[in-house]
Design a protein with these regions (language model features):
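Secreted/periplasmic proteins that engage bacterial cell-wall peptidoglycan
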Residues: 1-120
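Aromatic- and glycine-rich peptidoglycan recognition patches
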Residues: 8, 102, 108-170, 175, ...
């Protein structure tokens, strides 16, 4: 049963020196530490799923480039096209650019937009973005692959789709009452 109290991350506070992102993170240990979207997303996914904060429940996510995470299905995580709290948003680049991007879903708004937490290789240490459905693209050149679900937060798209539809219905109902 998922914990009902997801704690979103909207600032970098608590990241520097945190073992999820540093000493216990395979990207950091391989020389690809922060700022780096894969290092950040891997660490945040683990931080979200490690309910006892004892560094157990180590993820089996890909340790390759961001655009490879979606196809790394041997990790055993459910995947889908519906956003979920704590899920990894997977994007691939176009044919002539970079290595994709991964981010973590921190909030799902009633209108379907999501807020993601991010880091960028050679760029920003930490930042958030608000992205719109249906493809949740932060910039031109990216292609939406989908979401990898964190099992601690429900584990599958069906659960999250029901929650999202309920929130959407409630938001619509509130708007009707206001008018």
């Amino acid at each position: 049963m998922p914990d009902p109290q997801y704690i979103p991350r909207f600032t970098s506070r608590g990241i520097r020196g945190n073992p999820y992102y540093y000493s216990r993170n395979p990207f950091y240990n391989a020389g690809y530490g922060m700022p780096n979207c894969t290092c950040y997303a891997w660490g945040r996914f683990w931080e979200n799923g490690d309910v006892d904060h004892d560094y157990s429940n180590r993820p089996t996510l890909s340790t390759g480039n961001a655009e490879d995470w979606w196809g790394h299905t041997s990790d055993g995580y459910d995947r889908g096209d519906t956003p979920a709290l704590g899920a990894v948003l997977c994007l691939r680049d176009g044919p002539y650019s970079g290595d994709g991007h991964v981010a973590i879903v921190e909030e799902i708004m009633p209108d379907g937009r999501i807020i993601t937490s991010n880091s960028a290789w050679g760029g920003s240490f930490f930042y958030t973005q608000t992205l719109s459905p249906p493809h949740y693209l932060p910039a031109a050149g990216y292609h939406f692959q989908g979401f990898i679900y964190n099992p601690h937060w429900g584990g599958g798209a069906g659960f999250f789709k029901r929650i999202w539809l309920l929130k959407k219905w409630w938001w619509k109902r509130e708007q009707e009452l206001i008018q």
